[in-house]
Amino acid sequence: MKNGNGFQFSRRNLLGVGVITAAAATLVTTAAKADDAPADISKLPRVKQVLVAPPMLPEHEQVVTGGPKIIEVTMTIEEKKIVIDKEGTEIWAFTYNGTVPGPMIVAHEGDYVELTLKSLATNALEHNIDFHASTGALGGGALTKILPGQEVVLRWKAIKPGVFVYHCAPGDVMIPYHVVHGMNGAVMVLPRDGLKDAKGNALKYDAAYFIGEQDFYIPRDEKGTFKKYASAGEDLPESLDVMRGLIPSHVVFNGAVGALTGDKALKAKVGDNILFIHAQANRDSRPHLIGGHGDYVWETGKFANPPEVGLETWFIRGGSAGAALYRFRQPGIYAYVNHNLIEAVMLGATAHVKVDGQWNDDLMMQVAKPGPIKA
């Protein structure tokens, strides 16, 4: 079968379209032989990090003492059918550890991240992982291509502090195809002495939440109804045609419309400092906390740069992650949105934060209730 681009579709292509990265892996291996031997890390302590489903982060320290560690993590690739809205629209999501987005990994500058990446034997496609936080080999993508039933181990050194995207990048059109099927997540590399403001004062958070913004491109049938498919990869030619239009059918937080609202809303208390980590692997976004602000915002996500202060809306470039710290001063339900309001309200890019505590009339009060206009 061919799509409008003349690309031939078959299971063989699905499993073998990553020739570019396979060739790159050969070049990387050859070049590595000529490089200096890696540092001796055999005596570094090893820590197994238990990854958790977003929006939560794994257990971690904000400030560390002592030297670097090897952070061991395991992720399992699973192709699974998920429902992305209340109308029952489905997609075969490509996931790390079964979630969209994949789990947050947390390390400190100078640590080593050692990933064991597994692909379930029941999967249909070839996958890999590209860490924007890493250095070399296409972010590790050239060294991690695996088929169903395989695993690979990759270790990289965290030399850049900040929050970074990771995603699948098997080659050619399969790169955007995998990314817009949910195969992305984020890494946070903290400075060893923690976050700081522009004057070097320590900044700490009481809780942190990972919001992964995802654009989906679901094909429709001749009646305009979203199509459903029996297996992973079956939608490839039709999805590519929709993707070429650059108009998503859904823009959601954490995998589905309403995934972070209602009884799944994020939680905080008045006085809490909350760190929001926002990642978008494919499109630009404009996070805004309705009723609040970004007290300290690392808009580009890089903690070596001083944070901006007091922002109303911040900008996340497609293919990056950013972080915003806010101290909640009033109770109530806050809406955290992509402030392209069409995408927030009509396509799904909205989360809620439920904040408990006492109301402060000095910050805001209703002076007069709604009533007839006075003469």
How does the language model describe each region?
Residues 2-375:
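Copper-binding active sites and cupredoxin-like electron-transfer domains
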